[in-house]
Amino acid sequence: MDVTSSTVQLNTSDGKMDAHVAQPKEGGKYPGIVVIQEAFGVNSHIKNVTERIAAEGYVAIAPDIFHRESERLIPYSDMPKAIATLQRVVDSKAMEDIGAAIAHLKSQSNVKSDAIGVIGFCMGGRLTYLAAAHHAEDVKAAVPYYGGGITMGNPSPLSRTGEIKAPMYLFFGAKDQLIPMDQVGQINTELTTRKVPFQMKIYPEAGHGFFCDERGSYHEASAKDAWEKTKSFFAQHLK
């Protein structure tokens, strides 16, 4: 499906926030999906993912969670700066940003306002989990990829698991040195205990960032399998 992309500006309590929007060229009404960035900004990878999602028949939006920063794009080679920047992200502010993106989707005439999903990677994986709880009335499907720190924070996203209403598909790599497998186990246990409908896939040969083909950690077989599962999951719950 052919897509068109653009940048829109959304209002937040801290000023304007850019968001990358991709949507099918063909008319009609489509589900909406919020794409939440890694700790490197709304870069070419995140824009590409947004456009790939749109090509499957969705209106996709990637809000710039770093809009409060002077540097909003960080190269993959500068992990210290990425970590320092993500540590300045305040959960409540990020939830406001994601809420603005959801509101934008719901306001569009070509979006099915009752069919909104969220997907995120790395930092965005954690925020996807949190958004499924914080925006539970709007989020109908959530897909966190290698969300580090879900068990961390005050309160942690994990502590809000009981608020989640949407089905969730979580992806991790067994060789992820940033997300210990005991954390993944805690997430699995809490989702099960709270009776959240979820699926989880752990790729034995994949590390952190395995889905991003611009990173050295890209693992093609795992990325392709996860993408097929993601497409099927969103189609099942949003279409």
Regions from the PLM with identified roles:
Residues 1-239:
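N-terminal cap/leader regions of alpha/beta-hydrolase-fold enzymes
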